[in-house]
Amino acid sequence: MIESIVILVSALREELEQYGEMLALLDRQQQQVIARAADEVFQSIGLIKSQGVAIQTARARREVCRASVAKDLLQSEHAPFADLIPLLPADYQPLMKALVEENNELLVRVRQRARQNHLLLSRSMELMQGLINTLFPARETRVYNGLGVMNVHGLRTRAVYEAVG
């Protein structure tokens, strides 16, 4: 049983490391968005996706290890950490509790930062769309009617020189 606990501790540490890496990538992306470094923001998307895969892998490994410890403790393989930690040897309880709490806290921070970045990127897109619409007015407007159906209204197109002059 001790061996499976040690493996679970290792898996929790790995998961914690992966969340930390993701938070660092999201922090960097946020700085790049604020600095309007479009190329760097674009490159960060691939890194963030790769890190998301690494997190999923670490999470899956941790779940397998948790199920193994649960089985060793004669519990359901779906037993949550809250049920398992009190059943662990006393020497491992504080460590396991701390790792689980740190993972949960870091996950919350990662989610918050991802939401912040999403809002920043969405706002940047809205501003850019507004600029494009001022430079090149749409040939049609889309408006929802009272029934929630989108109506399309055509506009007279103007040549660029007419819009400028």
What are these regions (language model features)?
Residues 80-165:
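Short terminal interaction segments
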